[in-house]
Amino acid sequence: VAASGSTNKAQTASALADRIANGVPVPHVLTRPETDKGSRMIEIWTQAALDAGQAIMAVHKAGPNVSYKNDCSPVTEADQRAETIILEALARNFPDIPVIAEEAVSNGAVPEIAEQFFLVDPLDGTKEFIAGKDDFTVNIALIRNGVPVAGVVYAPCRGQAWTGEDRNAEKLTVSTEGAIEARHAIRARRRAASPVALISRSHCTAKTEAFVAEHGLKDCVSVGSSLKFCLLAEGVADIYPRFSRTMMWDTAAGDAVLRAAGGRTLDCSGRPLAYEVKGEGEDALANPDFIAEGMTA
């Protein structure tokens, strides 16, 4: 069953921007799938993400102390606290699955990777977090044979989370205490007559602007972090072009949610974005340019 298709298509870019800025939920009529073993696994990751979000919000309220990594990107105590919480939860529940986590990699800890591994970004959108905006997220994804098969994204400042696995995607409403209050299934929409494009708030490039102009994308909304994937998955936007550097942990969880909702993420050759670690160091974990989108047919 399509989710509020006609209403979504009628939204203007300014109205969408207001809804996004205010964290207004979009109603859907899909029912929640039955819980199976995979769902029970993702519930564990979801709880880890919620716990990490609580730690992040504690730092958010107190005001973050900012330091800088070797690549000059910012890092805060919130990043480090959140990652510790997630790594402990994953090690306790899934000790045999290796984890690639952003802050650990920055400190030189890259585990041996098997066919299955976790990708963790404890705080995606650190710049937005430091600036006092609300579009930062906690991200946990499971990769199997290069494919993001399941993921959870949590936006603690908005009280919203998204999960995706095996063609089932959900949006969760979360209390300020980190408890799940409601959940409903979501689905990406087919491309609207006037498509809405989501653009990185902090990394919009000349190549992105050229793509927008070439494809006649007149309705563009700037959004930070992996929220862009989740908004595509919800069916409130249509396309997210990314032509600047991202790392696998930035995209995997949101990509998993989008794929579970019926969307897709393609590299510039038209192949599904692959999460395959080739080579050594951080460069081996970098993504190529990509385009994420909702349903195309």
PLM regions and their residue ranges:
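Low-acidity, Ser/Thr- and Arg-rich intrinsically disordered low-complexity segments
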Residues: 4-10, 14, 19
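Glycine-rich active-site/cofactor-binding loop and its immediate structural neighborhood
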Residues: 118-151
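Acidic beta-strand-loop-alpha-helix segment within the catalytic core
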Residues: 140-230, 277-297
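Residue-level signal for inorganic ion chemistry
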Residues: 56, 79, 90, 126, ...
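Conserved acidic residues
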Residues: 115-117, 149, 218, 238
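N-terminal subdomain of lithium-sensitive/metallo-dependent phosphomonoesterases centered on the IMPase/IPPase/PAP
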Residues: 28-123, 210-213, 271
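Oxyanion/phosphate-interacting regions
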Residues: 25, 30-47, 210-213, 230-297
